[in-house]
């Protein structure tokens, strides 16, 4: 039997190894293909979703469709809102990596803390949760928590330790007053294994996305 193909459109190489490894664990019978364009994130951080971003991403999703992808995942939440436009152009399912996480957070409900280390990701992540709650008829209170600039620590080995320490401490803090803690960026999944027991669920987008892909592909 031919393997199902999952295509991930990435805006950086930072999460490639983690996503490849997690996919191999959770979806061992799937063929994973990565498309990487590291010009997308700087543009989105500076100017939001621009025509240039839409043009490039349109090309990538159409290439993925022509390559017989069974599902396409958008890895970066900073350009996630482009998916709402581009998914109308193709017939293949096109998922924002944080959509399943948003649904799970809303199902848990109540007070939702969303921790991010990039403002261009945090804002659309919060909007996605609010829109998901509206669609599902749920009332939630979303609290954005920006750890500004912390993502830049991931560029060095010593910085990675500091990044993980800062994010973990913030998770513990937000777990005191909220019903669920959401990690806004795929790059933050790395801290899950470092967390000690928390009072509430802590959700990461790669894990919930691959769980959703498994259900979709059957």
PLM region spans:
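Non-catalytic structural scaffold of enzyme domains
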Residues: 1-218
């Amino acid at each position: 039997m031919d393997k199902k193909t999952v295509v991930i459109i990435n805006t950086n190489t930072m999460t490639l190894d983690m996503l490849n490894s997690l996919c191999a664990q959770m979806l061992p019978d799937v063929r994973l293909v990565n498309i990487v364009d590291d010009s997308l994130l700087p543009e989105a951080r500076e100017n939001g979703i621009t025509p240039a971003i839409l043009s490039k991403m349109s090309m990538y999703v159409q290439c993925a469709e022509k390559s017989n992808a069974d599902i396409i995942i958008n890895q970066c939440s900073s350009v996630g809102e482009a998916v709402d436009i581009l998914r109308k152009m193709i017939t293949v399912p096109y998922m924002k990596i944080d959509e399943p996480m948003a649904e799970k957070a809303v199902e848990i409900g109540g007070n939702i803390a969303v921790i991010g280390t990039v403002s261009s990701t945090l804002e659309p992540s919060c909007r996605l949760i609010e829109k998901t709650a509206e669609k599902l008829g749920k009332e939630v209170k979303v609290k954005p928590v920006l750890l500004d600039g912390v993502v830049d620590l991931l560029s060095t080995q010593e910085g990675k330790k500091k990044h993980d320490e800062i994010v973990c401490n913030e998770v513990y803090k937000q777990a005191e007053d909220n019903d669920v803690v959401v990690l806004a960026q795929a790059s933050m999944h790395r801290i899950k294994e470092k967390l000690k027991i928390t009072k509430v669920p802590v959700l990461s987008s790669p894990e919930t996305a691959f769980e959703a892909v498994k259900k979709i592909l059957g």
